């Protein structure tokens, strides 16, 4: 089953993306480099719980 997750910017801007992840095949926390439009550069986004 795919669960919804929130990818939060590590730049401290408060920007986030939402996506889904298969917890059976990827049990660890997800870290992806994506574009932060507030900081206007690519930064690391870390997985947090979607409330």
Swiss-Prot record:
Q: GO molecular function terms here? A: structural constituent of ribosome
Q: What PANTHER family would the database entry show?
A: 54S RIBOSOMAL PROTEIN L39, MITOCHONDRIAL (PTHR15238), LARGE RIBOSOMAL SUBUNIT PROTEIN BL33M (PTHR15238:SF1)
Name of the protein in its database record: Large ribosomal subunit protein bL33
Q: Per the similarity annotation, which family is this?
A: Belongs to the bacterial ribosomal protein bL33 family.
List UniProt keywords, sorted A-Z: Ribonucleoprotein, Ribosomal protein
One GO cellular component from the entry?
Answer: cytosolic large ribosomal subunit
Q: Locations of Polar residues compositional bias?
A: 10-20
* UniProt-listed PROSITE patterns: RIBOSOMAL_L33
An example GO BP is: translation
The record, for Pfam families, names: Ribosomal_L33
Q: Which Gene3D superfamilies match?
A: Ribosomal protein L33
InterPro entries (UniProt xref): Ribosomal_bL33, Ribosomal_bL33_CS, Ribosomal_bL33_sf, Ribosomal_zn-bd
Q: Which residues cross the membrane?
A: none
Glycosyltransferase among the record's keywords?
A: no
* Region Disordered, annotated ranges: 1-21
């Amino acid at each position: 089953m795919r669960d919804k997750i929130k990818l939060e910017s590590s730049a401290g801007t408060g920007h986030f993306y939402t996506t889904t992840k298969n917890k059976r095949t990827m049990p660890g926390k997800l870290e992806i480099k994506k574009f932060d439009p507030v900081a206007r550069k690519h930064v690391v986004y870390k997985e947090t719980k979607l409330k």
